[in-house]
């Protein structure tokens, strides 16, 4: 039984942060750590004590993780960043409420003695002889200790306490992965029982030693199950700091843990779901999909939609699934102006489908224009209430401009950017994924059939543009970081420019139906350009759905990442491991990397025809590298194995911590199916005849640090896993099981009220046949859920 977990994290905002700069303000950002591994960094909000981030992350991780931490720092352009405070959440605290955490949490001070990490390997034996008890503690090694020295390492030693006695190991200099292999023996008087405590310290020549962590074992543990293995280091027990003086963060955190059964156990549920999409949708109230839509609340509907879309994508049935939901939605809609405007399961499913299969397409269309807006930083404003004439003067004019001058200049800039956006969209038909085009064609046909009158001639266009423009292009323009179009959020001026562009794209997506209405009359100068663009968009939508329905969108089961699909690309600094070579920072060379569904390739420039490729099937590990290995930050390693079984390591330096984590995540997901993955590797470099991490002298020595192949960031390129998605659907149905049982009772009571001698067609309530179908479908579904629940219990007992 496979085990998986994912953390949904939203860093919303901060309040009442302390000032760290002489100006009386701060430049705060937030680091997100999972078990001491940095997985994300928010943008820096300049000159603010109440920053708004609004950043979301999904982290896939193993079930044995321990804690999640948020560190708030003040960015300094010179010197080290100042630590403001931290929030630490244990796994138990996150799972205490099934809905997760959604609240303001006070920041607490960062106590160096509480900042511990890593593990220690011990083998403890309790012996008895005529002189009393003897405890033999074999201190083997430790790994991933906290760096306490400026070099990014420590000088660790272990101190063992038992009763009134204590002993120390030797000190090993400049390593976070010490190998002691020392046996310490302590004696205790007969008749006494004492706990065992092992502390790790960093030795300092000047000043006091720094605490690295501790483990403690009760007398009962020593007697019944003497410790032997790896043990996680813990901080000294201390009183909790209620905080408040350092400000607070508003966080949303939810942990989802699943134990995924073998595929055959989900087959009955899958058959029920597949039967749903193959049956009539308009009056369906009995299928599992119809019941799921009824049970799903607004809060979880988006997550459910994502799981269902992925499940049917993995089965090659995303088209029929979306068509089923579309037919249900259209049949229930009387006013075409409200079609797909709600957050129904149909709307959310189509929205998630666009993000899953169309993200690469979105990047190709919008990235060039978005990059121009960020880089050129032009001032644009049409609203006279928001015009800043002084800013316009600094940027565009020699003298003091008038509102009319600002409006004319802004209109020219805005139409220029908007023209580039429209040109990119209407010329992108050939780049739009086939699966998306087929889904839009089915959508248009269904809408056209329902609203066929001449007065509804635009509805077939609005149905598509409502998704493609209003739920895809416009949100990506408004918040490009959330769609991975930029690494940072926009500054206020650029954000306003993006808002104006997004409003214009929304107006085009609405086919100009609301032009001249509402309070934003200041957009009137833009109307001629918008009306001109709308006719081009209609032609584009006609071309988009002009596709042969017999074509298959990626075969029987559609993969999100095809072999030729570029998942990630950009410049990195590269260095290959060379036996006998000098591990210096000058050995890194700038290369342009592309990660596809087939390989990791690189060349001197993006246009360079000659490139070197690393097949994904050869990758055995993708891991962080300690900063001290090359005196460089943000370095990772890709460990590969050739046909002869020889290992090779390529070191890559990324531009920042987010770039590093995104490359790590993308490479780990791309190489996830590979056999023979390494369970440990070296986070350092081999130079001067030894590894910089663990100081071992053999180049071929076994790795000293565990690999983290299971830790990845969730995004559109996540591999499809139908079993995991089926498990998520089962979990959602399980939450609504009581409602299903209540529905079954209601249907049964209604059925008894139907007069058998009366024609069912004349009955005011539901007919007997429909009630019987509902009761049978609900009973069948409840039985499937019960069978799955029993299977989980059986596997739980075995494990």
From Swiss-Prot:
UniProt-annotated binding residues for Zn(2+): 682, 693-694, 704
Pfam families: BTK, C2, PH, RasGAP
InterPro entries: C2_dom, C2_domain_sf, PH-like_dom_sf, PH_domain, Ras_GTPase, RASAL_RasGAP, RasGAP_CS, RasGAP_dom
Matching CDD domains: RasGAP_RASAL
GO CC terms, sorted: cytosol; plasma membrane
Binding sites annotated in the UniProt record for Ca(2+) 4: 149, 202, 204, 210
Record: residues binding Ca(2+) 1: 21, 27, 74, 76
Annotated site location: Arginine finger: 341
Protein function: Probable inhibitory regulator of the Ras-cyclic AMP pathway. Plays a role in dendrite formation by melanocytes.
Protein name: RasGAP-activating-like protein 1
Species the sequence originates in: Mus musculus
Gene: Rasal1
